[in-house]
């Protein structure tokens, strides 16, 4: 993928703050990988006659996480730690779909409609594309973004683009948003030799880099909701 991040508050006013490239992979029911392989940051032009440049900053790394269906593994480059978050049993097998961006990780229409108000916004000039606009229904999703535009290719019916609008986005005033473009889309099929398939091998526990520390967080304990005692109808009031 290619990713452009716009930040009106901490970035330039008229262009993107960072440009990244990387890969996203997904395998049913709940295996996923998100890896930023290169991130370039905005550098202001040295004079009015020159253009801004984008350069890699030493020590700055993008996101890298893997979900194997039972745990999420995240690389913390700043602290040289591989963090494993074990998922509660009731979330294993469905964590990615319930995450912030279900459009990329196999959510079905029922799940999408449960979490979002969705409408078609395809322009008459769009070629071989379907554009959808999704507004979050829950406070949890609304805390992550204001709305999302999903661009679907009619050739393979896979997402070819995604625009995630920041909560503070205001057209003409605040352009904070994240734009994804998915160019090399591919569908891989499972087989009985998954462990020998390089595509599926990415979803097993990632290796620990030399000199790094592995940190394991146990699954959080989910407690049943507290029931309120019903009042005895014979109790005097």
Give the predicted meaning of each segment.
Residues 40-42, 79-83, 140, 166-169:
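Short, surface-exposed beta-strand-loop junctions and turns on beta-sheet-rich folds
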Residues 23-28, 53-55, 65-68, 146-161, ...:
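A short, surface-exposed beta-strand/turn
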Residues 1-79:
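N-terminal mature ectodomain segment of secretory-pathway/periplasmic proteins
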Residues 37-39, 75-78, 87, 137, ...:
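Surface loops and adjacent helix of pleckstrin homology
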Residues 29-35, 126-135, 158-163:
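Short, hydrophobic/aromatic-rich segments at coil-to-beta transitions
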Residues 73-103:
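Acidic/charged, solvent-exposed loop-and-adjacent secondary-structure segments enriched in E/D, K/R, S/T
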Residues 126, 139-146, 154-237:
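Non-transmembrane domains of secretory- and envelope-associated proteins
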Residues 108-119:
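A short, amphipathic edge element
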């Amino acid at each position: 993928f290619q990713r452009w991040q716009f930040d009106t508050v901490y970035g330039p006013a008229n262009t993107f703050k960072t440009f990244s490239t990387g890969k996203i992979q997904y395998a049913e029911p709940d295996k996923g990988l998100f890896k930023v392989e290169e991130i370039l940051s905005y550098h202001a032009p040295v004079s009015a006659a020159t253009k801004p440049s984008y350069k890699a900053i030493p020590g700055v790394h993008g996101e890298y996480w893997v979900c194997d269906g039972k745990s999420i593994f995240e690389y913390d480059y700043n602290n040289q730690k591989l963090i494993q978050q074990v998922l509660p049993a009731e979330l294993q097998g469905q964590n990615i779909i319930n995450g912030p961006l279900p459009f990329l990780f196999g959510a079905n229409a029922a799940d999408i409609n449960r979490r979002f108000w969705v409408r078609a916004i395809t322009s008459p000039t769009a070629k071989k594309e379907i554009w959808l606009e999704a507004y979050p229904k829950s406070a949890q999703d609304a805390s992550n973004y204001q709305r999302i535009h999903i661009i679907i290719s009619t050739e393979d019916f896979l997402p070819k683009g995604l625009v995630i609008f920041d909560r503070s986005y205001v057209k003409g005033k605040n352009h904070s948003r994240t734009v994804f473009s998915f160019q090399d889309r591919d569908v891989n099929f499972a087989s009985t030799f998954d462990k020998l398939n390089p595509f599926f091998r990415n979803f097993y526990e990632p290796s620990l880099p030399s000199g790094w520390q592995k940190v394991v967080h146990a699954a959080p304990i989910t407690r049943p909701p507290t029931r309120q005692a019903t009042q005895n109808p014979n109790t005097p009031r």
